[in-house]
Structures are given as structure tokens and as C-alpha cells.
A protein has these predicted regions:
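HhH-family (HhH-GPD) DNA N-glycosylase catalytic core used in base-excision repair
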Residues: 2-289
């Protein structure tokens, strides 16, 4: 109750009629200052360890609650495939693992700028239906709110260019390997050079964004899309990988009292590659804690 009152007070001080995400971020930054008296430095090992321990304690507390959230993601994915297999034309999703992997791949670029439910789910499903109908992966993202393959509001988010790039890579892989070969490749390790070469063959330039390591470093195939959307696809396939979306970035920075960028905007993504790598270490340390 005290937290809600403070968030409401922060919102009112800015002239907001109801609290916004920015107001909650300010509350957490204020709370952090009250506890520690300063920001914690993620590059300082002692501060980093303190944030890891605090995070692990929060998770243990939450797991002891009646509604812990444990397993919700896996259950949602399982239920999604069960529901999709009831759609005419998608019956194979009930037991066709390769087709399921293809859907999880299509769900990655179509997630950009969208909520998982219903926008992302509808867009990925429409793309799969389009492929099964024509034999070609669609690469021209429909506008937000469009009716696609008979599905209402199955368009993509505002960043059409980013969606288009990911779909081109998937299209190239399916055309050159077939669906079964694609599924094997998507969940198998490849060098960063191979991922980059695939992107170039699909008409793109440069290595996948956010994927660190030298040209001989190994990464699962889905990372050809880049760190964020590639790991999102891995999550849908049951792999433990941290998607560094706005929610994760906010949670990570909350533990250091650093939820805002120098310009005052909310930190909604890793600020640079070193921070991205530190986030990976953070997750590993919390799991070990």
C-alpha cells in the first residue's frame, strides 16, 4: 500500500492522471537510494555480487507465493500449439516438430514492436499459413492491424524494416534446406562467420546484432537473427536463454538503481555489448545462487 501511494504521488507530481511506467521506475530508483544511498556499479564485483544476491532472494520469495509464475511460459507455449493445431490448415502442429520450430522462428521477427498476445501470435500464425499455402515464406510484413490469411489484426509492428530482414533470412534457409533441414539448422551450433555468411546470402549485410565473439565462436542457428529475437525463438523451443527485452532490462537496472539513461529516458535494452555480456553473467550467477 505504501509503495502504491508513493507511485501515485510521483505520478501526480508530474501531472499524470494515473501512474505510468516512468513513475514506477522513479519509485524503484528512489527506493534503491533509500536502501543503499547510491547507485550500485555493475562493473564493480562487490556491487555486482550484492545485486545478484538480492535478485536471488527476491526470486526465492516469489517462488514461495501462491502464484509464483513458475512454468507459465512453457505452459503458454504448449497451450499455444494445442490451440493452433485446431486451426484448419495447421493440424500438423499437433505433432510436427519441424513445423513447430518454423513457427517459433517466424514468431521471432514478427515479435518486434508487438505484444506476444495477440499481435505476435497472430502475425507468426498468418506467416506460417501463408507459407503452407504458397510454399514461400512471406517477406513483406503486413501493416499493423491488417487482415492476413483470414486472421484479423495479424499485421506486424511499426518497425517493418527489422521484421522484413528477419523474414528474409528464414525464407533463404527454408528454401535452401527445406523445413526439416531448417529445423535442424535452427537449433544446431554454427560459427559466427557462418551466421554472417547466411545473412549475406539472404541479402543482408553484416553480422547479427548483439552476438559477441570472434568469427569462430559458436552460436545456435536462431542467433542469425540477432541476440534479442534469436533468443526469443530459443525460449519458445524450451532453451534457457535470456531475451534482453525491455522487461528484463528494467529488472536488471532496477537492482543497480540505474533505470534511466543519461538523457533521462528509460533503459529499455542493453546500452552496449559489454553491458549485454554482463547481463548474461548476471543471469548465470543468479541461477547458481
Amino acid at each position: 500500500a505504501a509503495a502504491q501511494t508513493e507511485v501515485k504521488s510521483i505520478a501526480e507530481s508530474k501531472g499524470n492522471t494515473k501512474p505510468k511506467v516512468d513513475d514506477v521506475a522513479d519509485y524503484f530508483n528512489n527506493q534503491h537510494q533509500r536502501i543503499y544511498g547510491r547507485k550500485l556499479n555493475p562493473d564493480d564485483d562487490a556491487d555486482f555480487s550484492l545485486a545478484v544476491t538480492d535478485t536471488a532472494n527476491e526470486i526465492r520469495y516469489q517462488l514461495g507465493q501462491g502464484t509464483s509464475g513458475k512454468g507459465w511460459y512453457d505452459n503458454d507455449v504448449r497451450q499455444t500449439f494445442e490451440n493452433l493445431s485446431k486451426i484448419p490448415g495447421l493440424e500438423r502442429l499437433a505433432d510436427d516438430e519441424s513445423l513447430r520450430v518454423l513457427w517459433t522462428a517466424l514468431a521471432a521477427p514478427t515479435s518486434i514492436g508487438q505484444k506476444v498476445d495477440p499481435g505476435n501470435t497472430k502475425a507468426a500464425t498468418a506467416a506460417l499459413l501463408g507459407y503452407l499455402r504458397t510454399g514461400v515464406i512471406p517477406t513483406n510484413p503486413p501493416a499493423p492491424g491488417a487482415v492476413t490469411e483470414g486472421i484479423t489484426k495479424a499485421g506486424c509492428g511499426a518497425d517493418q524494416k527489422a521484421v522484413d530482414a528477419g523474414m528474409k533470412v528464414i525464407k533463404y534457409l527454408v528454401e535452401t534446406k527445406g523445413v526439416d533441414g531448417f529445423a535442424d539448422w535452427w537449433l544446431s551450433p554454427h560459427t559466427l562467420k557462418e551466421l554472417t555468411d547466411i545473412r549475406k546470402a539472404a541479402g543482408l549485410s553484416g553480422a547479427p546484432s548483439g552476438v559477441a565473439g570472434g568469427k569462430d565462436s559458436l552460436h545456435l542457428g536462431s542467433m542469425v537473427l540477432g541476440d534479442k529475437t534469436g533468443k526469443y525463438s530459443l525460449n519458445l523451443n524450451g532453451y534457457q536463454a535470456t531475451t534482453k527485452d525491455s522487461w528484463f532490462s528494467r529488472s536488471y537496472n532496477r537492482h543497480f538503481g540505474n533505470m534511466r539513461n543519461p538523457d533521462g529516458s528509460l533503459a529499455e535494452a542493453p546500452r552496449n555489448l559489454p553491458e549485454r555480456a554482463r547481463m548474461e553473467e548476471f543471469v548465470s550467477r543468479v541461477i547458481d545462487e
